[in-house]
Amino acid sequence: MYKDKKIACVIPARLSSSRFPNKPLAKIHGREMVLRVADIARNSKHIDVIIVATENKVIKDLCNDNDYLSITTGTHYTCTHRVAEVSENLKCDYVFNLQGDEPLTKPEWIDEMIEYGIDNEVDVLQSSRKLENGEIDDEDVVLSLIHI
């Protein structure tokens, strides 16, 4: 919670990645990536509820067995669609979309984005960075077009 606003974190996770199949279950120092990402959300000062959104029973069971709420969703073209499906039924003021393949995210970054968004009455925030040489042609790099 931040300034009396209830904040949910939805973590989309799917097994059928074409570039890295079963990515959410890949172990990092003995713990599955999806659990590491959920741990990051749990360490945020402002996240009130964490939900892993997945179409897969293996991920759902893993999360539930490790004290994380997981909801089975339909099949979606993007993770954003998966988050939107889950968000429709949440009783909260804000939804933080934390991608299930971002195990290097720091809880402080989440808190800073939440604080900035609420303090400045911003409807949508997206983290990004400037591209490095050659990345524009790399299909593994998600691109953001920003007009300043």
Region locations from a protein language model:
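N-terminal glycine-rich phosphate-binding loop and ensuing alpha1 helix
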Residues: 3-54
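Short beta-strand segments
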Residues: 12, 97-99, 127-128
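Short, high-confidence coil segments that cap the C-terminus of an alpha-helix
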Residues: 47, 92, 119-123
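Short phosphate-binding loop-to-helix
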Residues: 57-115
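Conserved donor-nucleotide/metal-binding helix-loop-beta segment in metal-dependent transferases, i.e.
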Residues: 107-135
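Conserved small/polar residues in nucleotide/adenosyl-binding loops
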Residues: 146-148
